[in-house]
Amino acid sequence: MSKKTKILYYNQVMDRSGMKNLISRLISYIGVTSASEVLDQLKTIGFNYATKFGISLGIDDLLTTPFKGWFMQDAEKHASISEKHNRYGTIHAVEKLRQLIETWYTTSEYLKQEMSPNFKITDPYNPVHMMSFSGARGNASQVHQLVGMRGLMADPQGQIIDLPIQSNFREGLSLTEYIISCYGARKGVVDTAVRTADAGYLTRRLVEVVQHIVVRKIDCGSIDGIQLKPLKEKKIKNLFGSADRLVGRVLATDLFIDKRCIAKRNQDIGSELAINIINYQKKAILIRSPLTCKSKQWLCQYCYGWSPCYGDMVELGEAVGIIAGQSIGEPGTQLTLRTFHTGGVFTGDIAEHVRAPFNGIAFFSETNLQATRSRHGHPAWISKEDIKITIQYEEIEHKLNIPANSLILIKTNQYVKSKQVLAEVRAKIAPLKEQIEKYIYSDLSGEIHWGFPVRHTSEYIYSNLHTVQNTGHIWVVSGNIKNSNKNLLLFYKKGDYILKDFLNKKLNINFQVYNKKLNFYQKSIRNSKKNINNLINSTEFLNINSSAIFATYRYKNTKMNENNPNIFSETNLNKYSLKKFYNFVLEKNQKFISNNTKIASSSIYKHHIENCGIIKYGSIQIKPFPSNFDQDLNTIKEKIKPLKLKYELINSGTIFWIPEYVHTLVCSRSSILVQDGMFIEAGTEIFRGFFMPESGLVQIKSKTNKIHEITIVPGKLLDSIDIFDNLKKQKFFFYPGEEIIPGIKAEVLTYLYLFGVNKQKNKLLLRPAKEFFIEKLRKNPINLIPIFGTKKDIKIALFEFIVYEDGQQVRSKGKIELVQTCLITNIKKGPYSENAKFFSIDVFFKNLRNRFLNFCFSNQTNFEKMLSKRNFHKNLYFCFKTLNNKNKENLANKKNKDSLIQNKGYLQLLETKNTINKNLLFVSRKNQIQILYNKITKEDLKENYKDINTISKIKKTKIYHTDQQVFTIQSFYLLNKNLGLLGNFYKNKLLFQFIFDYNKIKTYKKDLSLDINTNLLKNKNWFLIDESNNFFQLKTRKNQNVKQKKIEKDIRINLGNFFSQNVVLFNTRQLPESGQILYIEKKICVFRLCRPYLATKNAIIYGNYKQIITSGDNFITIVYERFKTRDIIQGLPKVEQLLEARPLNNLSSNLDFGFLDWNTDISRLLGNPWGFFLSSLIIIRQSQLELVNQIQKVYQSQGVQISDKHLEIIVRQMTSRVLTTEENGPNAFLPGELVDLFKAQRMNQILENSLAYKPILLGITRASLNTYSFISEASFQETTKVLTKAALQGRIDWLQGLKENVILGGIIPAGTGYQKILNKKNSNFLENKKEVSIFVQKQKNIKFNILPSNTEVNKKESIQNLLKKLHITYTFQ
């Protein structure tokens, strides 16, 4: 009895590649018939188990990776860093775009990598995971867009959109993301239909080119072939890379491994031999190819190889041309469909990086390094030669070899971390590049400045276009220009501060426009009569009567609360004694005030709680308050609804707070584990992962099907039938120790909460409560500012308000203030009270900070065109009036004499009493004083301020102020619409000010009055420049923040210097804005706002130096190179572009000057004529192989595998024609005529005057119209033209192709049985014919007998070895 053979058992998962290998082996070992039976059994088993398992795809099967949120946060952080560096001017827009693309592409790839482990861990039998990763349906990219992120998209031009789609299809896309997604998907179904038609037309053209190619011979006798090199680098796609690209080919030479022959010439390569070649062969091998077949219009078996259908040598008569055309054109439809499904997702490769293996110190030589910038704008060094980097950690040492022309991203002796990028290695074969122009738009209006050499472009030598010669910064200095043709009788010089509407004829304030930058006059005007006469002669101004109250406090070492600046209000202002301080936060500036308007609120919270609950009034008494400030204050981006102070506190009393917990859940109702009205103990799970914090009642309110609000009412539950009768009537609060019902006493302050259906089912909940005692302030109104000799025009009083109503439920996540203390105005009606406004000003001097609370009353005056210098000293008021230190009288009744302040700066003539005309004084730094007269009319006031009560405007201005090592940059808000500078002066009358020293106030006794210190105002200069003036609506109630910076003593800066944002100039503090130094004094440094833009070499600047541009103008164009994106959307058009031989933007670097290089090298070896001939052959062969590789890359990027032999057949027909040149003598061809390559070669073997021609690459359409058959050409395109031309030329169609025989109804010259019929007809002609044609003999002599006959063998071998080094394979006879 024979032994039973052992059956092999493979216990492994059979995915798509595994099934592919199984089918291939079955066909190889048992044949097609038996393999089909085995596969039928596999199919039956698969259907059976798929039916039992019941696989279906649902929306819940799409599981998002839990790490996505972390990846998104990290990517957003990197994107914000790139944005900051672009704003600082360290990188330009292109480098920012590259960083952004790199960041989001890496994030997308990490998400894709985490997708498979997440499925395997959480749900290994997930239908999405099984279908995609087994290869049954879909791929990783499509599943990644379902559960990961959509990623970066390409626009219709193929450029990457810098806004990534962070959502996936499971989460859903926003409107913006959907529009971008439509860009990438190329408009969906319509485009898909168009691409499908294009794919069909591509298949028709491909079949048209090669329809006549049939296998006719077994061996054509060719000894030439194409070389395949071993694959060494992962980035270089080579034909030697995998066994699939070797299987089915035929060797052109014998194959040796270590002097042992493992395969002979004309031997086909099977799977085992292919694996051995890949593993052991280190040199290039030569294989047969359709490109080198000697047959004229057909192919031989050896040059074609295996048939892809049967896994054996192709049979004679096989129509391999049609098979090749269809195999290339059919995946074009797949490219189209995948374009629609995946939608233009960016799939670019990240540069190949060299990373550190472990932590340590890097050492390398810096002798041959040259400084440069990486493509992301980081500093880098390029190495001209190979460099060795040594990583050393303690006694461990590791060496890395970096090839030449690589970017080194670290310095020597630098500590590096594990996996840190050390260098970027460039590929040996540079990919195709294209030049792109990036337009840069200005963010500011202003002048263009640059400090590097530029030149005019050669195309526009007389224009304002300039080309940047070296990389540098272009600065836009903030500003605008205002030209006018009117006459203004006024004298001023460059640098003087002027009113903002100085050049306008009328004051036009548009209250409906916000975020509009104001114009200011910046152009320097010379002191010539001609320019002065052209200025405006009449201007209308808005004068504002300003008064102020302020307090001063001391801060040490610049440590103060910047986010909450306070003002201090003292109880009895008339006696100047300090009893109590209240900290108040001012409301936002520019608010129009009326009677009962809140101007400040207390910053000290006494009665606040931190959770939700219910308000219950105790013994307090309230009354409604007629508030004028309860309207909503809105911003552009968000709406803020402030608390409405409705109820004024009348007397002291108590208020109760009953806490509860409120949570909002977004889930289905079934996910909530408790029911409405249930009493739950502490620790009970309410929702997945959420537990009860305390025992209490649960109330559930469903807003929608997915949004539910859960209210947890803490307390103790009492359930008794007699509970309602035993309760004390009309009492709901019980203090600790009081009896609630017989036998139950309150442990804490308790509130009774009754709930139930009726008396029989009443339940009682004992809820904990809090009690607050609120004390009523006994405060009389304060006469803050006497206006026009009176003290009762405006008053400010302290009020306390209850914010919430009795029984109101309060919902808030933060602190809740129950009672608020506010400053309320009390203004009597008068001529100025309707347009009263208030704002605050902070003034810094040494270590004192002065806060001014200013009240403004508007009136309008009209300046006449007259100049006067009369008696201006008598009418001059000063901003800072001084009193004697010994003076203790009431400031309101004090009549102080005017005296000039001995400090530098600008003074202004203020309003005089009892006069109609108002005087205005301008004082420049050279003490040139002019007085202008003005008048006021009621009509102008009504016309210009008709909307003044409905819409409020403020002007935002930057102040740069320094004083004794304190550098302050403050966002300054003022209401003066005309004054461009606010410093040690005001527009109109300022009667008095109070200055309090905070430290001195603490030491004073209660009855002592305060002294006014005159030394505080000595040598005080501060300026406000209006380059950043803006109109804004009242949008927010945020506090005004002040930033302090210290100035070092030795700062070497000059006028006109530019400084970028975050540059450290003053100790360790950084500049908050970029700017140019405009003014320097001993203690002051004024910056003009700027914006830097980095421009690279050869960038184009639109405009001249100091030219004015507006915001949004395109003023720089950066020209840069980028790799051509291997985008899915470009699959089918890219294939069509290659097959039609359309020129690309740039040639690949390995083809540049390739012919000249080969010609030079071979001419040096073999002489000029032979060198020229051989270099032509080699460069043609190289071009053919490069075209095959380019087409393969497009298909391989989509996962489509096409046999190389099919592409080689197509390329063979594209290069089968040559173009005759004008160097020909008298022969049968004209210059520029297309001739068959084989025909030209045979003619040159006979003719004495050889035919001069050059190779040409024809597209498939043009090649289809230049074949041997005019019937085939006429059936393809241009029927009339082709037939007419053929008739004139007398062409004969020998009906050798398939198409022409189909048209005429003849026997198709193809098929496995056609060769027998052909052999039977021509048996007499072909019998015993062994003579060699004279043409073949002549060709062999020319091609291979290059050296003289007496050349020695050793010389032949040396030349042959040299040619092999140049990758040329020839055999000498």
UniProtKB/Swiss-Prot annotation:
GO biological process, one term: DNA-templated transcription
Keyword Acetylation: no
GO function term, MF aspect, one: DNA binding
Keywords assigned: Chloroplast, DNA-directed RNA polymerase, Metal-binding, Nucleotidyltransferase, Plastid, Transcription, Transferase, Zinc
Catalytic reactions on record: RNA(n) + a ribonucleoside 5'-triphosphate = RNA(n+1) + diphosphate
Transmembrane segments: none
Localisation per UniProt entry: Plastid, Chloroplast
Cofactor: Zn(2+)
InterPro entries the UniProt entry points to: DNA-dir_RpoC2_beta_pp (IPR012756), RNA_pol_Rpb1_3_sf (IPR042102), RNA_pol_Rpb1_4 (IPR007083), RNA_pol_Rpb1_5 (IPR007081), Rpb1_funnel_sf (IPR038120)
EC nos: 2.7.7.6
UniProt signal peptide: none
Cofactor note: Binds 1 Zn(2+) ion per subunit.
GO cellular component, one term: chloroplast
Highest taxon above the source species: Eukaryota
Primary residence: plastid
Functional summary from the UniProt entry: DNA-dependent RNA polymerase catalyzes the transcription of DNA into RNA using the four ribonucleoside triphosphates as substrates.
Family: Belongs to the RNA polymerase beta' chain family. RpoC2 subfamily.
Protein known as: DNA-directed RNA polymerase subunit beta''
